[in-house]
A protein has these predicted regions:
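Generic protein-terminus/edge-of-domain signal
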Residues: 1-59, 63-64, 71, 103-104, ...
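Short hydrophobic beta-strand segments that form the core of ligand-binding sensory/regulatory domains
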Residues: 39, 74, 89-94, 111
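Solvent-exposed, amphipathic alpha-helical segments
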Residues: 46, 119-126, 130, 195-206
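Short beta-strand His + acidic residue motifs that chelate non-heme Fe in jelly-roll/DSBH
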Residues: 49-51, 67, 73-84
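A short hydrophobic beta-strand segment most commonly corresponding to one strand
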Residues: 66, 82-102
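Double-stranded beta-helix
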Residues: 96-119
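Amphipathic alpha-helical segments that line or abut small-molecule/effector binding pockets
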Residues: 114-121, 125, 164, 168
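Short, Lys/Arg-enriched, Trp-marked, Pro/Gly-tolerant hinge/linker segments that flank
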Residues: 134-139, 144-161, 167-210
C-alpha cells in the first residue's frame, strides 16, 4: 500500500486586500500609512525610495521590498539623494495569512529573477478576472470593488497560489542566493536621512514620555 506524504505548508496566503499597478509621474509623494497586513512594493520601471519603519530604502527596476504589519511606510518617485526625480511604475500587493516565515524578510531588498517577475504579470492577468479596474493608465484592483462573480472560475485562488509561489521563491533565494538579497543600504543614503532615522527611533522609544 502506498503511503501518503503529508504536505506541510511553510506559508499560506488567505486574504487579498489590494492589488495595484501604478504609473507615477516624477514628483509623486505618498505621505505614508501603517496597517495590520503585509504589503509588497515592486518597481517595474524607474526608481523609488521611502521609509520602511525607521529605515530608508531605495528600489530600482526589478527590485521589491516587504512592509511588515503595523510598520509605518511611505513612498516617493526617484531616489532620496538624487536632485533629479523620475517617473516610476510600481506594483503594490497587500495580503494576509499564515506568514510567520516572512519575518526574516524584514529590512531586506530582493532583486527578482525573470521567473519571479513573470509571476507578477500572471497575478495582474488573474486580477482582471476578479476586480474592476479603472483610473486612466493605472490598473486598480480593490477588495472593496470586486465583481460579484469571478469572470473565470478559480481566479482568486490562482492569485493566492501565484503569490505563494513568489514568496516561496524568495524564501529559497534568501537561503541559497544571498547575493540577490541585500539589507537596506543605510550607509549610502547620506547624513540627512540618517538623521531622520535617528529622530524616528528616538520618538518610538519615547512615545509615552514627555520630550
Amino acid at each position: 500500500m502506498l503511503k501518503a506524504v503529508t504536505i506541510e505548508p511553510i506559508l499560506k496566503v488567505t486574504d487579498l486586500y489590494t492589488l495595484y499597478y501604478f504609473q507615477h509621474k516624477s514628483g509623486y509623494r505618498f505621505e505614508g500609512e501603517s496597517h495590520d497586513f503585509w504589503e509588497i512594493i515592486y518597481v517595474d520601471h524607474g526608481r523609488a525610495s521611502g521609509l520602511n519603519g525607521s529605515e530608508p530604502y531605495e528600489l530600482k527596476k526589478g527590485q521589491m521590498i516587504f512592509h511588515h504589519p503595523n510598520v509605518f511606510h511611505n513612498f516617493r518617485t526617484g531616489v532620496m539623494t538624487d536632485e533629479v526625480d523620475e517617473d516610476c511604475d510600481i506594483i503594490v500587493i497587500s495580503f494576509g495569512g499564515n506568514l510567520e516565515v516572512l519575518e526574516q524578510f524584514r529590512d531586506h531588498i530582493f532583486t527578482l529573477s525573470i521567473y519571479e517577475r513573470n509571476i507578477f504579470k500572471q497575478i495582474l492577468d488573474e486580477g482582471k478576472q476578479v476586480y474592476n479596474k479603472t483610473n486612466g493608465k493605472n490598473l486598480i484592483y480593490k477588495k472593496e470593488n470586486p465583481f460579484e462573480q469571478e469572470k473565470v472560475p478559480g481566479a482568486k485562488q490562482m492569485i493566492g497560489n501565484l503569490l505563494e509561489q513568489l514568496l516561496l521563491s524568495l524564501y529559497r533565494k534568501q537561503k541559497e542566493c544571498p547575493s540577490q538579497v541585500q539589507a537596506l543600504p543605510l550607509q549610502s543614503l547620506g547624513m540627512e536621512y540618517q538623521m531622520v532615522r535617528q529622530i524616528i527611533l528616538f520618538l518610538e522609544q519615547n512615545l509615552y514620555n514627555n520630550i
